[in-house]
Amino acid sequence: MEAVPGTPPPPPSESPPPPSPPPPSTPSPPPCSPDGRAATPHLLHHRLPLPDDREDGELEEGELEDDGAEEVQDPPGGQERSRKEKGEKHHSDSEEEKSHRRLKRKRKKEREKEKRRSKKRRKSKHKRHASSSDDFSDFSDDSDFSPSEKSHRKYRDYSPPYAPSHQQYSSSHNAPLPKKSYSKMDSKGYSMYEDYENEQYGEYEGDEEEDMGKEDYDDFTKELNQYRRAKEGSSRGRGSRGRGRGYRGRGSRGGSRGRGMGRGSRGRGRGSMGEHPEDEEDLYEEEIEYGESEEPMGDDDYDDYSKELNQYRRSKDSRGRGLSRGRGRGSRGGRGKGMGRGRGRGGRGGMSKGGMNDDEDFYDDDMGDGGGGSYRRSDHDKPHQQSDKKGKVICKYFVEGRCTWGDHCNFSHDIELPKKRELCKFYITGFCARAENCPYMHGDFPCKLYHTTGNCINGDDCMFSHDPLTEETRELLDKMLADDAEAGAEDEKEVEELKKQGINPLPKPPPGVGLLPTPPRPPGPPAPTSPNGRPMQGGPPPPPPPPPPPPGPPQMSLPTHEPLSPQQLQQDMYNKKIPSLFEIVVRPTGQLAEKLGVRFPGPGGPSGPMGPGPNMGPPGPMGGPMHPDMHPDMHPDMHPDMHPDMHPDMHPDMHPDMHPDMPMGPGMNPGPPMGPGGPPMMPYGPGDSPHSGMMPPIPPAQNFYENFYPQQEGMEMEPGLVGDAEDYGHYEELPGQPGEPLFPEHPLEPDSFPEGGPPGRPKAGAGVPDFLPSAQRALYLRIQQKQQEEERARRLAESSKQDRENEEGDTGNWYSSDEDEGGSSVTSILKTLRQQTSSRPQASVGEPSSSGLGDPRLQKGHPTGSRLSDPRLSRDPRLSRHAETSGGSGPGDSGPSDPRLARALPTSKAEGSLHSSPAGPSSSKGQPPAEEEEGERALREKAVNIPLDPLPGHPLRDPRSQLQQFSHIKKDVTLSKPSFARTVLWNPEDLIPLPIPKQDVPPVPAALQSLPALDPRLHRSTPPGPPNTRQRPGSTDPSTSGSNLPDFELLSRILKTVNVNTPGQSEKPSDPRVRKTPTDPRLQKPADPVAASRAAKPCPTEASPPAASPSGDSSPPATAPYDPRVLAAGGLGQGSSSGQSSVLSGISLYDPRTPNAGGKTAEPASDTSAQPKGPEGNGKGSASKAKEPPFVRKSALEQPETGKASTDGATATDRYNSYNRPRPKATAAPTAASSTPPPEGATPQPGVHNLPVPTLFGTVKPAPKTGTGSPFAGNSPAREGEQDAGSLKDVFKGFDPTASPFCQ
């Protein structure tokens, strides 16, 4: 700002521009001339015009400077003369200006002398600076300025204005901005300035340049020079001003002229638009001066920059900024910078040439025109600039990584910038927009996997460097490893703290495991990513996070499919549909894969694999337990084998390709559980679809568990199932080894091992999404445990009631064997409730741990034994088996068939074990395995179906598990606002506003009243009318879920009602769904009995989730769990797509699509079964949601009151249980919930504990539409008691963010 004083403010009258100068004028205080007057706009104008004059003078000075101080010396006089002449000319402009100019000239002369000295000094300095010493004589700066004086002026204008502009605009610019500033300002600022110049300074230029331009310029120059001199003398010594002044001080004026001038209040003021620029310039100059101190950077850079800027400016001038630019700049910055520059140039060259005219010439010169000095300077400058451009001057901004000019930059970018020793966080995600220009490390970052294990699964395709470690890379690798270790330690601490609090967080996913599927290319994740590489879904990814950046991509890079390459099926499956979070197979990153893969290959590998290793290590056990729990856990721990449901079996399989996929196999989890049928399990559907998507295994996980357990019990998943193992056939053997231990362990600790937490928790754990942070997960598990306990108690209570009516669902008997695994409660339930047993078997199948959860489902489904089977079949089997069935056969029918089959099969026993599976498997897989008739066969088939459904199934389970965890909350919420809350929940996520009304329309109360009939109908219809059944199952399931959620008393009542109504409900269910209004009234009526009403409502809400589950069950695709996926895929994209579509549709029901459902009316039931399938749940979702949800609600509510609760509860329970019981289900369940709305799905995954509830709700919402609600209803049962109380609603609100909208 010193410059400000430097420029005497000419009377504004001096030139018309004064008005424009105000801006400069404002800066003018800084531009005060040495006289002490604030540079008035006039002065600024002068400055602007001065650029011409100055340019002339400056050119001379600049020339001198450029040429060396020599010319500067000559020009000083010449410039002075020119300036004087100009001054005289400008004299007319204003006396004051003239005096100022004269003073300035004197000062300038003195300054020029000083500057020459300074320049000489600088020259030596500059000479030190390669760039400076180049063409521009010593003073690269000065020279730069000189030759590029104009350019420089521009540069300065640019740069100071630019910088100033930046500085003006952002005042931190000074030196730093310069480069960029220069460049940018050059173009931008300059443009602005140009305009500014042209506008404000333009006038100044015009008037001042013409009038004042020359004389004033001289005077101004003199004054500025004097000012500068004073300034320089005072502080920087113009020359010493460093580049700023010295630079600017190309001549005496250089100082004033250059920035000096700019600096000189005028130059700068003018140069910059107004004072700020000047100030900025001053600042800049000061900085530059300091730059002198900074010389290396300042002078050198400045010189370089000056050169480049000068060149740039010159080119620009040449381009057209031309005079105005040169001058404009000159005027503007010109007077300040421009002047300094312009003048420097003009002055330098100009002076040599002839002063003022030269100034103009200089402009021309700059533009390419030029007079002697100008020309010379131009010559000098141009070559200089070009040389600079060509690499003489390194772009300082480029060095700083902020040059925006790119290839157009006038400065050299020919330097190899050292990369920041840090992995580019964008690169690891698979795309860095800066590509090779990125200052962070990309492919040159060391591959952690490769350098730590010596074997990178990505091989040559690895994103990271496999080159021998250098000191630098070793340091980076060590740092990364240290960070990983630190992160791991932190996680351990967190886990310890949680454990102290009594919370058993789910195991974290292996370092390489993540929620997101591993992208194919980023996969070459650097070893670092391996930890992150396979960021698991679970919160576990956090540990990997440190390396995540590298790992993240690597992990991601490991395409989930890639791992599936061997598992083309899974890959295909994935390709066919958009995987949901739960469905996503997270493949360990290359490193992880290597670690896991390396181990994976061996039986031990599966256990050993990092993810599986830890979890899998116990994989068998853990795997088994993890199965359900593992869903999430699997992601984290079983992660590797996750994919493989087949974890154990697949392990071998996995290692080969699953291995990376393993993570994928949340669903695959079941694979391991299939332990006995381990290989079969793997084959079960996952084998085929298994990998087809970890997910398929996931759904199977539910069924799978059932199958698995039943298998263990005797089914052993029959090799037939193993047939699915075809894919794993070779693995079967391998799995035998790892699988055996895994399987046995699995069976041993299926529940406890869920790794979700305590054995009891497994279900909850299973429900817990892996992506949840450990704390949340622990919380979630805890909640789930409580819910499970409650549900178990309920189931036990209900078991007796349901037992009577469960006989209807003898099919549940086959579940009993599954149930054995389900848990003690399952056993008691089996004894007490066959239906419950059935549902529980589902839970068992889902996982023993989910037995508790399963029990709730069972309880829910228990009311109606047959329904229970249906719901179960619809739900668990449907989800898993149906998915499979659908996958196998056409799921559209499969879905509906599943429910019916579920009934018929359960009845016939074909799918006895798989209540849902019977329908689905019967149609697709259930039927294929004739043995299925036997409970074990059914289980096996279930297992088989599971593979197809795995992804959906598991997600369903997970969601259910989550639901179970939040079942109490859900119930409350459901009770409070079954349909509306449900809608609300989805509304935010899925924009289910329409569904809300429709769901509301079919109020749960009405549903409860009619539901008893409807539910029974649904259940019965299911057996009688496969289509209806399918639809019914959806409805029934939702109802069942709802019923399960409702109080046991209600359930018993409902059961009675159901028994009475079951026969006639087959057709009505569809209609009732369609006719939600009656349902609503009924539901409302039931509302009278708070318990019934609330139960009904909760049921609907929960039923909705269960419905989704049943839907999923109905639709074998089991995409329901991944409804989002299904929705995205337009169906599961599995064979069970149709069935799943229904399910998904059901889930979709709550999806925004739900609102779409035009067929919400009568289609609900239908939609649930078949119609929705086509739409993939969109239409179905809409139709079902609108109507079916109401109906479902009815069903759900009714079921809670009626036996429907039993059947649907079973389904719901299945789903719910699956959700609770199998961790995979947890994943699946969230998926199911999320499947309805992808957002939901996503939400569940992000915050399992929270999401699960919302998921349940979300699921519930769709459930009403489809049978999905039932499963959730199943979940509701746990909350049944709570449902009655509005408090649950509050609880839910408190519990889940989504819940509050839902509650509302």
Swiss-Prot record:
Domain of life: Eukaryota
Modified residues (Phosphothreonine): 1119
Biased composition range(s): Pro residues: 1-33, 506-529, 538-556, 603-622, 669-683, 994-1005
Region (Disordered): 1-387, 485-567, 601-691, 719-970, 994-1304
Modified residues (Phosphoserine): 92, 94, 816-817, 913, 916-917, 1104, 1109, 1111, 1115, 1270, 1276
Classification via Gene3D superfamilies: Zinc finger, CCCH-type
Pfam families tied to this protein: zf-CCCH, zf-CCCH_4, zf-CCCH_9
Segments of skewed composition (Gly residues): 252-264
Keywords of this entry: Chromosome, Coiled coil, Metal-binding, Methylation, Phosphoprotein, Repeat, RNA-binding, Transcription, Transcription regulation, Transcription termination, Zinc, Zinc-finger
Identification of the protein by name: Zinc finger CCCH domain-containing protein 4
Native species: Mus musculus
Gene (UniProt): Zc3h4
